[in-house]
């Protein structure tokens, strides 16, 4: 019979304080460490920039000092090149009315754009936005990013799907989970220093995901950011871009009037 509080208990809880955050590890009786609970990050707003309040943001990328944005809604979906400082649209292509634009990724001199339920993606020249081709997608398209080797896609489920950069075929997948709890409704994606940052549909937070294991390493709660004006339930947080050169992180939402540059607490 085990005594209450015995160190021989089958599962003990070890609490560590790390950089102001509490990190919980479950340790079994063999001393084996099981997956830690995700860290929760604070943030500071470093800067704000104008954002088109009519842009139903579905994809966002920052490359060569310019923003590239995909907007949704049938009849008004687009691919845009945007000046960060002013929010001005420098170039734009409007999708045919039947397509609902979704996530985008830049692969060298190409822009890859998903559509929601049409099972098709588009490939554009990054410089002049000319349409180079299209490809079939067996899944719904939600978010898209690029890890310098593979395209990584979300489809509203609790999986990240890995696509071959040349053929666009799905070659692998990983289930996303926070401990033993699956994390679904994954939306817009951004690859940041080995991790995938993911919006979660209809939530004001971003999951930081290890793309190899699917473990959620951390959460960024952005409840404090001002979103769209009014009470539109569709105007959710959606849009993450990373400036690799200057280590800047940008976030916005659907029909939000502002784009935020934020810095995570260390």
Segments predicted by a language model, with ranges:
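A short helix->beta-strand "capping" segment at the edge of beta-propeller domains
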Residues: 34-53, 87-88
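Beta-strand-rich domains and repeat architectures in extracellular enzymes and scaffolds
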Residues: 46-78, 93-105
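Surface loop/turn motifs at the tips and blade-to-blade linkers of beta-strand repeat domains
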Residues: 48-53, 93-97, 133-138, 175-181, ...
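Signature of short aromatic-glycine-proline-rich micro-motifs recurring in repeat-based ectodomains
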Residues: 57, 186, 232-241
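Conserved beta-strand position repeated across blades of beta-propeller domains
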Residues: 61, 103-105, 145, 190, ...
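Short coil/turn segments that connect the beta-strands within blades of beta-propeller domains
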Residues: 64-65, 108-109, 148-149, 193-194, ...
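Conserved beta-strand positions in repeat-built beta-propeller and related beta-rich domains
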Residues: 68-74, 111-118, 153-157, 198-202, ...
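Short loop/turn segments that connect beta-strands within beta-propeller blades
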Residues: 83-87, 125-129, 165-168, 210-214, ...
């Amino acid at each position: 019979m085990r005594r209450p509080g015995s160190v021989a208990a089958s599962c003990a809880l070890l609490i560590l304080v790390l950089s102001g955050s509490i990190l919980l590890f479950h340790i079994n009786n063999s001393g084996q460490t099981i997956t830690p609970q995700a860290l929760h990050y604070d943030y500071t707003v470093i800067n704000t920039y104008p954002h088109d309040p009519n842009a139903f943001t579905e994809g966002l990328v920052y490359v060569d000092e310019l923003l590239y944005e995909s907007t949704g809604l049938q009849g008004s979906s687009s691919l845009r090149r945007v000046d960060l400082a002013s929010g001005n649209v420098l170039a734009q292509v409007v999708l045919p009315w039947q397509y609902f634009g979704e996530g985008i990724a830049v692969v060298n001199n190409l822009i890859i754009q998903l559509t929601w339920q049409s099972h098709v993606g588009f490939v554009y020249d990054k410089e002049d936005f000319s349409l180079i081709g299209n490809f079939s997608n067996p899944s719904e398209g939600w978010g898209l990013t690029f890890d310098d080797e593979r395209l990584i896609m979300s489809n509203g489920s609790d999986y990240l799907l890995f696509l071959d950069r040349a053929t666009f075929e799905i070659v692998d997948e990983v289930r996303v989970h926070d401990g033993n709890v699956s994390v679904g409704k994954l939306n817009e994606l951004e690859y940041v220093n080995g991790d995938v940052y993911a919006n979660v549909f209809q939530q004001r937070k971003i999951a930081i995901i290890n793309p190899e294991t699917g473990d959620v390493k951390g959460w960024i709660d952005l409840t404090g950011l001002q979103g769209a004006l009014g009470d539109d339930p569709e105007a959710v947080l959606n849009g993450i871009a990373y400036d690799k050169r200057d280590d800047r992180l940008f976030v916005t939402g659907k029909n939000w009037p502002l784009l935020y540059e934020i810095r995570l607490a260390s």
